[in-house]
Structure formats: structure tokens, C-alpha cells
């Protein structure tokens, strides 16, 4: 069964809405771990719309599970990662006008620069994951970068309307997991997963960790972070 990485970005979204000091993502991470989170994920965006560099530095000191830093493959972010040294980095595409990450990296068209970033980070002892769609050409390109992990983008599955469409997307993800494993890649997954749709993804053999954020933070507003994480853990690791 997959483990659970809790993305706490939207705790910071609430804080930044008022440009104040609360709620503190660092405190939220502690509560998530108390609830059973196996890891903490944050996305330090170039526009700093939610998570701030201060948050990542404090999380590096306080997280007791593992810290996954999502970031764009830019020189600024590489320098920050090399300085802070998260447990691993997930490279994601980023556009300033998007509300949230809209799809996977195009590794095929960015093979050379992504490979350089992967090798720089992994050469410094920081494992790298590439956030990609479950597309055979992208999977093959990801393997060529020497990244240790991929994170399969589950957004199309999450957004699929109707049972037939959802099962089709689930089959694509299942095939992607198997191809990735055959290429020697370790597999995580995430994006758009909720309490109502996570079960089928959690049952896919070969996925190591599910990274889930918005739905957990949404429930935490009502029942508290510890209980919200416990509820998700019960669904993915029954």
C-alpha cells in the first residue's frame, strides 16, 4: 500500500490571503505528522504565492518524516534546494497565471536542461522526482534523465466524468506505473485526489507515495488537521 505525503501549501494560502503570520504551515506539518502523515510536501513557487522560503527552512529543521520540495527547474530554485537540502525534490512545470499545476512536465522537449538539474541535485545527494503524465514517451524520457522517481499526474483521473471515463484514466495510470517500474523508476502519484476518489489509485500496485493536499486542508478546516490526515490514511492504508 502507498504511503501518504501531505501537501500543506494551502495552509500558507490562507495565511497569505491576509499577509499575516497565521496559520503557520510549520505547525500544520507537525499536526499532519501527528495524524500519521508519512511525509510533508510543499511547493515553493517562483511567485511565492503561498509557501515562503522561510517556511521551507523551518520545515527542514522540524519535519520528522521526510520533506519533499516541489519546485520549477530554475537556477534560483536549484540553488535554494542545494542550500536547504530537502529529503527529495519533485520538479514540476510552473506558469504564473495557473491556479494550480495543470499538467506534467514535458520531459521530451526539455530533456537536456532537466537532465542537468537532475544530475546537479542527485550529485549533491538529493533524490529527484519528475512530475509527469502517464505517457509512454514522457516516461521513457524521464528515465533518460537518471531521476530516481517520477510522480504520475492523477489530475485527468480526478477530473474524469462518469465511470467509463474514470476507469479509462485509471487504466492509463496503471500502465504508466508498470512501464515506469520496468524502466527502473520509483513511482509516486498525486494531483486532484480526494477522499472520494483516492481508493482506486491507492490500490494500484507499485505506487510508493500519494501526495495529497487541497482535500485534506479543506477537511481540516472542519475537523482539524490530525483527524483529516487520519481519515485519509484510513482510506489509502486500510
Curated annotation (Swiss-Prot):
What are the binding positions for 3-amino-2-oxopropyl phosphate in this chain?
A: 7, 18, 192, 213-214
A GO MF annotation of the entry reads: pyridoxine 5'-phosphate synthase activity
What Enzyme Commission number does this protein have? 2.6.99.2
Q: Mainly resides where?
A: cytoplasm
Query: Pfam families from the entry?
Result: PdxJ
InterPro entries (UniProt xref): Aldolase_TIM, PyrdxlP_synth_PdxJ, Pyridoxine-5'_phos_synth
Give the UniProt subcellular location, in the record's own words: Cytoplasm
User: Which UniProt keywords are given for this protein, alphabetically ordered?
Assistant: Cytoplasm, Pyridoxine biosynthesis, Transferase
Q: Which GO terms describe its cellular component?
A: cytosol
The pathway is:
Cofactor biosynthesis; pyridoxine 5'-phosphate biosynthesis; pyridoxine 5'-phosphate from D-erythrose 4-phosphate: step 5/5
Q: Which GO terms describe its biological process?
A: pyridoxine biosynthetic process
Gene3D superfamilies in UniProt = Aldolase class I
Transition state stabilizer, annotated site positions: 151
Q: Which reaction does it catalyse?
A: 3-amino-2-oxopropyl phosphate + 1-deoxy-D-xylulose 5-phosphate = pyridoxine 5'-phosphate + phosphate + 2 H2O + H(+)
Which SUPFAM superfamilies does this entry report, sorted A to Z? Pyridoxine 5'-phosphate synthase
Q: Please list the residues that make up the active site.
A: 43 (proton acceptor), 70 (proton acceptor), 191 (proton donor)
Where 1-deoxy-D-xylulose 5-phosphate binds, per the record, is at: 9-10, 45, 50, 100
Family, per entry: Belongs to the PNP synthase family.
- How the protein assembles, per its UniProt entry? Homooctamer; tetramer of dimers.
The protein's matches in NCBIfam families, at most eight in alphabetical order, are given as: pdxJ, PRK05265.1-1, PRK05265.1-3, PRK05265.1-5
- Matching PANTHER family: PYRIDOXINE 5'-PHOSPHATE SYNTHASE
Q: What does this protein do?
A: Catalyzes the complicated ring closure reaction between the two acyclic compounds 1-deoxy-D-xylulose-5-phosphate (DXP) and 3-amino-2-oxopropyl phosphate (1-amino-acetone-3-phosphate or AAP) to form pyridoxine 5'-phosphate (PNP) and inorganic phosphate.
Name assigned to this protein: Pyridoxine 5'-phosphate synthase
| Organism for this UniProt entry | Thermosynechococcus vestitus (strain NIES-2133 / IAM M-273 / BP-1)
Amino acid at each position: 500500500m502507498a504511503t501518504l505525503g501531505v501537501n500543506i501549501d494551502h495552509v500558507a494560502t490562507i495565511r497569505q490571503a491576509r499577509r499575516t503570520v497565521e496559520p503557520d504551515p510549520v505547525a500544520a506539518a507537525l499536526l499532519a505528522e501527528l495524524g500519521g502523515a508519512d511525509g510533508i510536501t510543499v511547493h515553493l513557487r517562483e511567485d511565492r504565492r503561498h509557501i515562503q522560503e522561510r517556511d521551507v527552512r523551518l520545515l527542514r529543521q522540524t519535519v520528522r518524516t521526510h520533506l519533499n520540495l516541489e519546485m520549477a527547474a530554475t537556477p534560483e530554485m536549484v540553488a535554494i534546494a542545494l542550500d536547504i537540502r530537502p529529503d527529495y525534490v519533485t520538479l514540476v512545470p510552473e506558469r504564473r497565471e495557473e491556479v494550480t499545476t495543470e499538467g506534467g512536465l514535458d520531459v521530451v522537449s526539455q530533456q537536456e536542461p532537466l537532465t542537468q538539474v537532475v544530475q546537479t541535485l542527485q550529485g549533491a545527494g538529493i533524490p529527484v522526482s519528475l512530475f509527469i503524465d502517464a505517457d509512454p514517451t514522457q516516461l521513457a524520457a524521464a528515465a533518460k534523465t537518471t531521476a530516481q522517481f517520477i510522480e504520475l499526474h492523477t489530475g485527468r483521473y480526478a477530473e474524469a466524468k462518469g465511470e467509463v471515463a474514470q476507469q479509462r484514466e485509471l487504466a492509463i495510470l496503471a500502465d504508466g506505473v508498470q512501464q515506469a517500474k520496468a524502466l527502473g523508476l520509483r513511482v509516486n502519484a498525486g494531483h486532484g485526489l480526494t477522499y472520494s476518489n483516492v481508493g482506486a489509485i491507492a490500490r494500484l500496485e507499485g505506487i510508493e507515495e500519494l501526495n495529497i493536499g487541497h482535500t485534506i486542508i479543506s477537511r481540516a478546516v472542519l475537523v482539524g488537521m490530525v483527524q483529516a490526515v487520519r481519515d485519509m490514511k484510513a482510506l489509502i492504508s486500510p
